[in-house]
Amino acid sequence: MATQISKKRKFVADGVFYAELNEVLTRELAEDGYSGVEVRVTPMRTEIIIRATRTQNVLGEKGRRIRELTSLVQKRFKFPQDSVELYAEKVANRGLCAIAQAESLRYKLLGGLAVRRACYGVLRFVMESGAKGCEVIVSGKLRAARAKSMKFKDGYMVSSGQPTKEYIDAAVRHVLLRQGVLGLKVKIMLDWDPKGKQGPMTPLPDVVIIHTPKEDDVYIAPAQVVTQAAFVPEAPLTTTDYPAMPVA
């Protein structure tokens, strides 16, 4: 017998489930370019779509890795048998995915690359991928014992209002280095895309679109054909026409 719960409890339960699932997959698939998860609940089963840059590593050899993840999720969240299905979806453009770039920056720093060089590399790659703006913030013990933050920006970035929810893709990651923990924050501003593939379909509120004027139709009057009147010679004047006319 299905238990009845209020709408508020249902939303809270769904939010907690999504947060825990995202945390589990972030730890398991960090090295495989994990970029987010989407949960679709159908009457028959629950579908979980994992977005990653390297989907082949997520699937594993002959689908072994994805089956292990399915079993893990099923036992962790107590799903009935064969009621949950996991799929792997490749990220179309990883340069416009903040989570993928934050993970990339994290592994660059773990590999010993300088902070400034790693951040500028991420910044350049994001802008070359078609983003409208990008911001990278690294905070922690960067050089000296005193903690500080470094901010790298390029392009155009909005910071308030509804466009921040539609246009800004942000991600936060932490990396443990020898001097301590560094915090990494990547913000990417997408560009307006009427098709909705590379960015939001709704334009920014302050964007003014100037359309090219239409060409004026030039009215050409039909040519008039002037026909020359036929010359009719006049008859010579006579006394009949003018009786008072003297006769030469």
UniProtKB/Swiss-Prot annotation:
Protein name: Small ribosomal subunit protein uS3x
Record GO biological process: translation
GO molecular function annotations of the record: mRNA binding; structural constituent of ribosome
Keyword RNA-binding: yes
KH type-2 domain span: 21-92
InterPro entries named in the record: KH_dom-like_a/b, KH_dom_type_2, KH_sf_prok-type, Ribosomal_S3_C_sf, Ribosomal_uS3_C, Ribosomal_uS3_euk/arc
Modified residues (Phosphothreonine): T212
Homology family: Belongs to the universal ribosomal protein uS3 family.
GO cellular component: cytosolic ribosome; cytosolic small ribosomal subunit; nucleolus; plasmodesma; plastid
Keyword field: Phosphoprotein, Ribonucleoprotein, Ribosomal protein, RNA-binding
Keyword Nucleotidyltransferase set for record: no
Lineage summary: Eukaryota, Viridiplantae, Streptophyta, Embryophyta, Tracheophyta
